[in-house]
UniProtKB/Swiss-Prot annotation:
Family the UniProt entry places it in: Belongs to the plant egg cell-secreted peptide family.
Annotated Gene Ontology cellular component terms: cytoplasmic vesicle; extracellular region; vesicle
Reported function: Involved in the regulation of gamete interactions during the double fertilization and to prevent multiple-pollen tube attraction; mediates the redistribution of the gamete fusogen HAP2/GCS1 to the cell surface after secretion upon sperm arrival.
InterPro entries, per database record: EC11-15, Prolamin-like
Chief location bin: cytoplasm
Keywords assigned by UniProt, alphabetized: Cytoplasmic vesicle, Fertilization, Secreted, Signal
Species for this entry: Arabidopsis thaliana (Mouse-ear cress)
Residues making up the signal peptide according to the UniProt record: 1-25
Pfam families hit by this protein: Prolamin_like
Lipid biosynthesis is among the record's keywords: no
Name of the protein in its database record: Egg cell-secreted protein 1.4
Gene expressing this chain: EC1.4
């Protein structure tokens, strides 16, 4: 009976030492700034909220873009899409109800140098 208790005690002690060594041996990532004042002063958070607010105002343009194929997204709408997908939360558009494919189409359209114009494409020249 004493040998069973000794074996159990030794096993539990060894397990605790092994777990303690494993947990204490890994590097933890450096803490990001948890100070809310510092995050608010950085400007990034406000830029994201402003872009989200602007995106709300161009929802009709985006819906027409997907329903009718109209390529008349305004410059401010494209800037908002670009800010949200690159600087803020890449999945934010999907959380607003857009599929990942639609978010990629919007991002691709807005990153195109000719996007954001409301003017139609020039007609081809006849030679």
């Amino acid at each position: 009976m004493a040998s069973n208790t000794t074996f159990l005690f030794s096993t539990v002690t060894l397990l605790i030492i092994l777990l303690n060594t494993t947990v204490s041996g890994r590097d933890l990532p450096a803490e990001s700034s948890t100070n809310i004042a510092a995050r608010l002063q950085s400007g990034g958070l406000m830029e994201c909220w402003n872009a989200l607010y602007e995106l709300k105002s161009c929802t009709n343009e985006i819906v027409l873009f997907f329903l009718n194929g109209e390529t008349k997204l305004g410059v401010s709408c494209c800037e908002s899409v670009d800010i949200i997908t690159t600087n803020c939360w890449p999945a934010m558009l999907t959380s607003l109800g857009f599929t990942p494919e639609e978010a990629n189409v919007l991002r691709g359209f807005c990153q195109n140098p000719n996007s954001g114009d409301s003017s139609p494409a020039p007609s081809p020249k006849i030679v």
